[in-house]
Amino acid sequence: MKRLITLILVSLAIPPIYAGGAVDTPFLNSGPYVGLHGGVALPSGSDLNAGPVVGAQVGYRMGNVRIEGALSYYSNSLEANSDAKLRMTTLMANGYYDFNFNAPLVPFVGVGVGWVHAWRTNNGVLLNRGPDNNEFAYQGIAGVSFRVSPRVTLGVDYRYLGWTDGNGSQNLIEMSVNYQF
């Protein structure tokens, strides 16, 4: 966990070092993009350990506004039994607003709504899965992005992911890379 936090802090520190070589084209060009994201999921108030989150997104930028669809996978082990896991898949529709200050770093905020499907395993054996494991999901997002080239953007963000059954939520720290067409 300490290594992940160190990696995130170093990643945030590197972009300003290279800001002098930043692209001179406008940051907020309109058009479609695709990307990958990954990070750590920190469960809120539960008996679960932190675990990985990975996923992909496809979206469209219109000036300061972005709309995207994202598919993510989460895996958290139980504190009492590391062989028992809670696994989740989410499919989210996200909307973002990018604050363009004509600077290399662009802060953004966003919200998302979608679907979460959760299931439990123990030693790889499926314990429960079915239609009762589907819930409405929602998230709030805040982060910062950096344009590496005219088409590539790196980002770091925090997300609060919740779902309607009221039995839990996740705090997510993620890094992303997007390629704009």
Swiss-Prot record:
<dbReference type="InterPro" id="IPR011250">
    <property type="entry name" value="OMP/PagP_b-brl"/>
</dbReference>
<dbReference type="InterPro" id="IPR006315">
    <property type="entry name" value="OM_autotransptr_brl_dom"/>
</dbReference>
<keyword id="KW-0998">Cell outer membrane</keyword>
<protein>
    <recommendedName>
        <fullName>Uncharacterized protein CBU_1600</fullName>
    </recommendedName>
</protein>
<keyword id="KW-0472">Membrane</keyword>
<comment type="similarity">
    <text>Belongs to the opacity porin family.</text>
</comment>
<keyword id="KW-0732">Signal</keyword>
<feature type="signal peptide">
    <location>
        <begin position="1"/>
        <end position="19"/>
    </location>
</feature>
<dbReference type="Pfam" id="PF13505">
    <property type="entry name" value="OMP_b-brl"/>
</dbReference>
<dbReference type="InterPro" id="IPR027385">
    <property type="entry name" value="OMP_b-brl"/>
</dbReference>
<dbReference type="GO" id="GO:0009279">
    <property type="term" value="C:cell outer membrane"/>
</dbReference>
<keyword id="KW-1134">Transmembrane beta strand</keyword>
<keyword id="KW-0812">Transmembrane</keyword>
